[in-house]
Amino acid sequence: MSSPDKVSVCGAGFDLEGGKKAGSRTASPGAPGAHSHGLDLGVPGSGDGKSESGFTDPEGFSFESESELIEQGRVVLWGREGRPGTPVDDQGDVVDYSFYLADEPAAIVPPPSVQGHPFPEGAAAEGSAENWADAEVGPSGRDVLGHSPGKWQQASAGRLHLCGPGPVRAWKNPERGSKSRWSLRVDPQQPSAKGPTRLPTHDSDSADESSDLPLMKVGICRNEGSQAKPGSPKKRADTSRQASFHCKESYLPVPGRFLTSAPRGLTPVAERPAVGELEDSPQKKMQSRAWGKVEVRPSCSGAAAAGALPQGLSRRKMAGGKKSLGGASQLALGRGFPACGERLSAAPPEPATFPPFSGVRPQGMSKKPQKPKHSSPGKKPAGRKTRESQAAAREDNDPNRDEVPRAQLPTHRPGLPRLSVRRGEFSSSDPNIRAPQLPGTSEPSAYSPGGLVPRRHAPSGNQQPPVHPPRPERQQQPPGAQGCPRCIWLQREIEDLTQQLAAMQFLTDKFQDL
């Protein structure tokens, strides 16, 4: 590029040598003696090429050792490949510096005093975000920008990162190379003694790109892991833009980290009221438990809640808590002793009006034991019990009760046939048939009383034996001998129904054969 294309480093506020304020540095390809009051490397102005604690290269360039510069608090702008004694090739003058510095590693070793120095408040970056700065040492011993753009490829010293505003922060990120990567953040809110410093450039494109940008920060970093690779200027321009924007993305979130870390330190102070509320919450929980579930905590709910109060609470809160807990404990206790610190002046409410204690059966809940009516298999329903009690009373009144075993109801009693007729329970010759099914023969009229006997005494376990013995008793007293006209009529009706049933079965058999 021609001489109007200049690169400037906003170095104001860097106290490099005994309080000397650094101003702006400008460099052009053909200006070896350009403004050298920028980033001072601590090299004396003699042209012999030697420094006090450094070493010399064949061309007379003078450098100090990096470790000593770090100890002295000076800014070192060294490229990885542009170290002293390394031959560099000149590739021409008409080359954009940003293309060569797009992928170049850069370094800044900030002294401890630099972190607190401000950046000029009125400083503005008029150049594009891809403006890069390089520092070399001229033949005269002054640290000037490079003579020719060809040396920018390997001897580039720094990369200019334009970042958003934020607090001063220098951190260390390990990289793959032998040395670490340092980044410097400078706070632009405090003015410096030199006043505003600008990045002068005459490139219209870069000016258009940077016109929309607010006050930016300058961060110079070095990446040891990557090496400079020669290539076309377009590719380097693209990579420079990407690198600059990546730099913005990586640096801009830094203020957020400190903003988020600050509340972390304040959390103990801010959480102390919340801790007090949490300490008060067990009291409220105990009150709710004492009121809602009295049977769960019968006697110690008030004392436990009073003991849960923190020691830091005032007596006023303690008194209020005890008052509220006193009512809860009285609700829970009933006639028992009150809570800790409570007097017996308040009359306890009647225990009958509150829910009872757990495990104690209340007086008003006497109906609950009646719930398991059919729980046990040996018990009988209430209806059966009444019927059996009536039958037992009849058996007691019967004079012939001792003639027949108790498990076998006598068939000669006048009441049993009537019960069997009303219920319609007539069984056939098969003793297992007890439902009002129509028998196949006319004999069931004699077995009708016998069918009742196992039906009524089924729960007692004597189901089958009572069916067989009544046969001789039927011969002694045939049906109808008791003078019951309705039994005779029912027996005739049964015979008619059996005949009809036989006819229906005959017809169904014929239809099945067809």
Swiss-Prot record:
The name of this protein is Uncharacterized protein CXorf49
> Which is a Pfam family this sequence falls into?
DUF4641
Q: Where in the sequence does UniProt note compositional bias of the Basic and acidic residues kind?
A: 385-405
Q: Where is the composition biased (Basic residues)?
A: 368-384
Residues of the region (Disordered) are 1-68, 109-244, 272-484
